Amino acid sequence: VSLDSVDLYGYHILDVPNDEGGRDCLRWQRVNGIPRERRYVRVAGVAPDIDVVPFVDCIDTLLRGVLERVFLVKDGPGFSRPPRPMAGVFSRRLAAVWNELAPLLPSTAPVSHGQFVQDCRGCKRKRYQRALDEKRAGRFNLEEDARLTVFVKFEKTDRTTKSDPVPRIISPRGYRYNLSVGRYLKPLEKKIFRSIDRMFGHKTVLKGLNAVNSATVLREKWEHFRDPVAIGLDASRFDQHVSREALLWEHGVYKACFRETKHKERLGVLLDAQLLNHCVGETPDGRVEYSVSGTRMSGDMNTSLGNCLLMCAMVRAYARARGVEVRLANNGDDCVVFMERQEERVFSSGLREWFLEMGFNMAIEPTVDEFEQVEFCQTKPVWTPDGWIMCRNISTAVVKDSIML
């Protein structure tokens, strides 16, 4: 990958073809400025010697995050573009899933702008109230308000376990856009999760459950099988691999939940703004601009819901194609699949290739046949006198809990 070409304004350029026959373009420029060190406080003497620090706010950090989490994937010693799905693969492979899910979807209407604001808490309510006031004053432009501001996530980054971690990028849209689309999508979230649960016939999306309830659900899945095993599915950088075709399938589910044609059409217009993303990021010493077709933007209102929906639908379709009975535990792109030991080989065979044809790099984690070794959302089940509970890795927990950002 070469970033040596420079335009008339001094911007370095990366210009690559996308899956729509167009071009995804990245431009960046270094300016005079001092990178900002992000401050944190550590309680000394209580944690193992694990190096956990946040990234510096600088153009090099932001540029690397954009390159490796949006534009490129690791390919041996170098990089290549993320895999893209075969044409029409979502409508073909997920047709049976859609036929199962559609009758279970809610039939609803959007909440008012005011109700959406009232449902927010703290600083968010103030910001969305300001956005509502601006929208009522006529200050809403879909093209401008759907643009994204990107920055490096301020988080505790483990640099011991991962010797060269890639910074994570947050990419929110404007508050007026989020207000407009949020009144449709936010009330849908739990309803669609329940629809997914009914489609599978058991609790599937574990989002929002506490450590005790999560462990209870996982144990029920484990005990459903006579000779159980569990397989973790690791979708490498899931957001980066969400293609335009995947987004269109996901958006179709949302629109099907609204009774009135005018609501379907208005939501469709708002969601179409997520199909081609225009992003800008600034640091004290530089600026990044890029446009990209498809790709999940981490700050979108439907990031959590959409990732759960896509992952559950694909695992459902894959298990049906293999003829394997499974019990799925899902929390976005984090998945564990339970099944009979005798069906493990059938399930695993061809999985990576099947998901690659859907546009996703899916790795199979080592199979476990002890319940205590099941890992879900960086926790494992532990037996206590009061029952099962999900617990974090003790070393990592002590290190991260002794640091305040």
What are these model-predicted stretches?
Residues 1-405:
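Viral RNA-dependent RNA polymerase
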